[in-house]
């Protein structure tokens, strides 16, 4: 999407500090962190909101959920971490 900040980050139009990237997913440190380790894990496919999720997105969202603890541990969160999903 033209005005989507996340799409611009994925395309490299807005600089970010990458944590992880594959064909489907992009993870980067939050531009305004509120914790010592604060990164965002987003699909490369533009999905504007959880309100727009469909059955066809099941595998992609599952991949993101499975990546979250792996990346958190790699970033030093060995004693637990908080996962937040913002909608809208």
Explain the meaning of each model-derived region.
Residues 1-88:
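HIT superfamily nucleotide-processing domains
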């Amino acid at each position: 999407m033209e005005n989507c900040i996340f799409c611009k980050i994925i395309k490299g139009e807005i600089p970010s500090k990458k944590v992880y990237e594959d064909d489907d997913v992009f993870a980067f440190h939050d531009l305004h962190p509120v914790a010592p380790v604060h990164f965002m894990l987003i699909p490369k496919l533009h999905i504007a909101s959880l309100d727009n999720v469909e059955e066809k997105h099941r595998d992609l969202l599952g991949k993101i959920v499975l990546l979250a603890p792996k990346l958190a541990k790699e970033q030093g969160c060995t004693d637990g971490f908080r996962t937040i999903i913002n909608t809208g």
